């Protein structure tokens, strides 16, 4: 069992249950999944870009990424239906908590000019979305092997009913929010 998973089970869930006034422990909000998405639009011209993006994503997540293909053809972008244009990974259970631990304790502190996570990035249903502009902030990525600096989107899906509950949950996991 991962460190954060154990911490959630033994401490965080009990504190949240009392704070939110929930009678049943199954009602307490928890993190359901983390989805990481990397757009590789310039992979149309060069297959090596797609390969390096997939490699970096698998190093970061510890799981093989799924290639995302274009749904429609767009002539102005020289894009045809079915062309690979990105990759994504959905993390659950053990790997999710391990990734969350690395994200909060190692990656976020390494971001340049970081002033805290925006609290406006909640979607109204208790899910949090954030973007990372450089993949080199992750410790798994070797700076020497990086061909191009790429960003990624991270979506944290929770079972929380409101944004306030989700913010309390993520704050318990030591997410550095602004203010």
UniProtKB/Swiss-Prot annotation:
GO cellular component: ribonucleoprotein complex; ribosome
Gene3D superfamilies: 3.30.1440.10
Matches recorded under PROSITE patterns: RIBOSOMAL_L5
Gene Ontology molecular functions: rRNA binding; structural constituent of ribosome; tRNA binding
Xref: Pfam families: Ribosomal_L5 (PF00281), Ribosomal_L5_C (PF00673)
Signal peptide (from-to): none
SUPFAM superfamilies (UniProt xref): RL5-like
Keywords: Ribonucleoprotein, Ribosomal protein, RNA-binding, rRNA-binding, tRNA-binding
Domain of life of the native organism: Bacteria
Protein's GO biological process: translation
Family statement drawn from the similarity comment of this UniProt entry: Belongs to the universal ribosomal protein uL5 family.
Entries under PANTHER family matching the protein: 60S RIBOSOMAL PROTEIN L11-RELATED
Function: This is one of the proteins that bind and probably mediate the attachment of the 5S RNA into the large ribosomal subunit, where it forms part of the central protuberance. In the 70S ribosome it contacts protein S13 of the 30S subunit (bridge B1b), connecting the 2 subunits; this bridge is implicated in subunit movement. Contacts the P site tRNA; the 5S rRNA and some of its associated proteins might help stabilize positioning of ribosome-bound tRNAs.
UniProt subunit comment: Part of the 50S ribosomal subunit; part of the 5S rRNA/L5/L18/L25 subcomplex. Contacts the 5S rRNA and the P site tRNA. Forms a bridge to the 30S subunit in the 70S ribosome.
The protein's name in its UniProt record: Large ribosomal subunit protein uL5
Organism: Vesicomyosocius okutanii subsp. Calyptogena okutanii (strain HA)
Lineage of producing organism: Bacteria, Pseudomonadati, Pseudomonadota, Gammaproteobacteria, Candidatus Pseudothioglobaceae
């Amino acid at each position: 069992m991962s460190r954060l998973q154990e911490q959630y089970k033994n401490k965080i869930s009990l504190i949240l249950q009392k704070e939110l006034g929930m009678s049943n422990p199954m009602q307490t909000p928890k993190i359901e999944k983390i989805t990481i998405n990397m757009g590789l639009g310039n992979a149309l011209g060069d297959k090596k870009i797609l390969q390096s993006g997939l490699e970096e994503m698998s190093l970061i997540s510890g799981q093989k990424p799924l290639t995302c293909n274009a749904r429609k053809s767009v002539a102005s972008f020289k894009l045809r239906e079915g062309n690979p244009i990105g990759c994504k990974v959905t993390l659950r259970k053990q790997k999710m908590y391990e990734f969350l631990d690395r994200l909060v304790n190692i990656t976020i502190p390494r971001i340049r000019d970081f002033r805290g996570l925006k609290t406006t990035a909640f979607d109204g249903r208790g899910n949090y979305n954030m973007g990372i502009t450089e993949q080199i902030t992750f410790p798994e990525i070797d700076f020497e092997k990086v061909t191009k600096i790429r960003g990624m989107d991270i979506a944290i899906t929770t079972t929380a009913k409101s944004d306030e509950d989700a913010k309390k949950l993520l704050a318990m996991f030591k997410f550095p929010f602004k203010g």
